[in-house]
Each structure stands twice: as C-alpha cells, then as structure tokens.
Amino acid sequence: MKALVGFRKKNKKDLYTELLQLLREQFNLRMQSVSGKLKQPHLLRKVRRNIAQVKTLLDSKEEIK
C-alpha cells in the first residue's frame, strides 16, 4: 500500500522509469528462481504487484489527458 501512494505522486515519465526498473528486477528474480538461488520468493509476487500498479496508474493518467 505504501508503494501505491508513492507511485501516485510521480509523474508519467517517472512512472515509466519505475516500470522499467521493476521489469528488470522481475527478470533478475526469475533468473535467480530458475537457478535455485532465490532466497526470498515473496519478492516475485511483490514486484509483480508493483508492476501491475504502475501500469494501472499509467493507463489512468493517459485517460485523464
């Protein structure tokens, strides 16, 4: 919930950079998961939810304009 509040304060450009960072992080976590080195599997779910939240906010900001 804290992340969503922080995402709402950002502008469109910052949301895109945040989305790219989250996608990279998701990729890295997936690679760690496949190789068996992932110590905290809950992070996959957390990152996936954050990606969905950022995408939803980007869509809503585009509808407003």
From Swiss-Prot:
InterPro entries in UniProt: Ribosomal_uL29, Ribosomal_uL29_CS, Ribosomal_uL29_sf
Domain of life of the organism encoding this protein: Bacteria
Single Gene Ontology MF annotation: structural constituent of ribosome
Keywords from the named record: Ribonucleoprotein, Ribosomal protein
CDD domains per record: Ribosomal_L29_HIP (cd00427)
Keyword Metal-binding set for record: no
Keyword Membrane carried by entry: no
Any one annotated GO CC term: ribosome
A GO BP annotation: translation
Pfam families: Ribosomal_L29
Family the UniProt entry places it in: Belongs to the universal ribosomal protein uL29 family.
Protein name (Swiss-Prot/TrEMBL): Large ribosomal subunit protein uL29
Organism of provenance: Buchnera aphidicola subsp. Acyrthosiphon pisum (strain Tuc7)
